[in-house]
Amino acid sequence: MENFMVEMAKTISWIVVIGVLGLGIRVYGKVMAEQWRMRRKLTMQGVKGPPPSLFRGNVPEMQKIQSQIMSNSKHYSGDNIIAHDYTSSLFPYLDHWRKQYGRVYTYSTGVKQHLYMNHPELVKELNQANTLNLGKVSYVTKRLKSILGRGVITSNGPHWAHQRRIIAPEFFLDKVKGMVGLVVESAMPMLSKWEEMMKREGEMVCDIIVDEDLRAASADVISRACFGSSFSKGKEIFSKLRCLQKAITHNNILFSLNGFTDVVFGTKKHGNGKIDELERHIESLIWETVKERERECVGDHKKDLMQLILEGARSSCDGNLEDKTQSYKSFVVDNCKSIYFAGHETSAVAVSWCLMLLALNPSWQTRIRDEVFLHCKNGIPDADSISNLKTVTMVIQETLRLYPPAAFVSREALEDTKLGNLVVPKGVCIWTLIPTLHRDPEIWGADANEFNPERFSEGVSKACKHPQSFVPFGLGTRLCLGKNFGMMELKVLVSLIVSRFSFTLSPTYQHSPVFRMLVEPQHGVVIRVLRQ
């Protein structure tokens, strides 16, 4: 009898396993059929692309191209640094197919169909598309959930629109102008530190790795401007976010393939204990900060971004008490994570690249220095003088053209969507590779790979053949909320640094852009600084 029960249990187990596998294969087959249907819809409209394999799409070819590039990696120096088209090493398969199929093509990662779209007219259509049917790419946002949550950066539809209405007013231009002094205050400790480093060296010159100092300054700015606290309070949050950023990027969140398990069980978690632990720790730290803020501000009507988020969370949470509490907490923590990360990391990376480019072009340092001392008392920008810094603006715009922190504009068609004459089927993921768009000679001219801020002397509208092709802050309805704030912060930081120091690239600098959610210097930017 006992043996019979054991055999029966084994039989039932096998039946369950076979049933689950059968159901999974059936579901997977339906999804694969849907991907082929999407591809056929695109090819019937003249969109070509590399032929995919049955189950893995173009992933094997992507891996092969990537490995070939890694084995042939080069080091760049001098003028070759600026001219170096790093997209050919960071995303070589996209570059390879662009040369083969043109500015618009389709490819597959197995269970997802993608549309590469770098044609200026289609980018313009994407920019003008005022619809909630183009959202952020769902499988990417799921894999970024640990660092960005379901905040305003990653959410879609009415949930995104509601969050944007709450947060946007804090970044209107009139408010941003009032934050110039705050950025100056946050930058001063960094400048003093660099001066002290030079004194300790006992020399007039000193090699400085600028990246972490810029991150600290930018983190202090976002902490004080948006959350009413200094960087010292949020230091651990920023440190953990940086660790989480590196851990997530190591998992290749953009183009990895989970295939069968993704389809049957949903996009699986990263399966990384370190990521899980970091996520829990960050959320705990942010929630502690929020509760401390609530205790301190009882009866206070201070209207910074933190207060707007708290009020928005209260107004948007429905359901029973337990559900409301969890919904309130998720709303607040997710948006704080998004703003903590995007608000400081992008600015710090942009200034790092700007200093690298200025180190190679000392004549532009001189022009900035002259302009700052002409318009800013004691070389310190304020709300009135910052709008007069035209040269600084040109240099920053050229930096964002050559080294935009964000590599992609990405969208997923949540419904069939018409862009110009092209109908994008529901479920297709759209990718616009910003650095390639920014270096296209047909758009920017023969000097597209050169550092020439003069091209922006009459503004973005006259800088290139298709002004809508300048998209460092994204485009359309999903344009970066912090664009005005970010530009102001960049102007202040660059003005303060260049007015106090002249610099060249250190011989120890290794030019190696890397993609870690943003395009950043892998080994940091090392400049050889001379006190003015």
Curated annotation (Swiss-Prot):
GO molecular function: heme binding; iron ion binding; monooxygenase activity; oxidoreductase activity, acting on paired donors, with incorporation or reduction of molecular oxygen
Record key words, sorted: Endoplasmic reticulum, Heme, Iron, Membrane, Metal-binding, Monooxygenase, Oxidoreductase, Signal-anchor, Transmembrane, Transmembrane helix
InterPro entries, sorted: Cyt_P450, Cyt_P450_CS, Cyt_P450_E_grp-I, Cyt_P450_sf, Cytochrome_P450_Monooxygen
Cytoplasmic side: 26-532
Domain of life: Eukaryota
Enzyme Commission designation: 1.14.-.-
Cofactor: heme
Record protein name field: Cytochrome P450 714A1
Organism this protein belongs to: Arabidopsis thaliana (Mouse-ear cress)
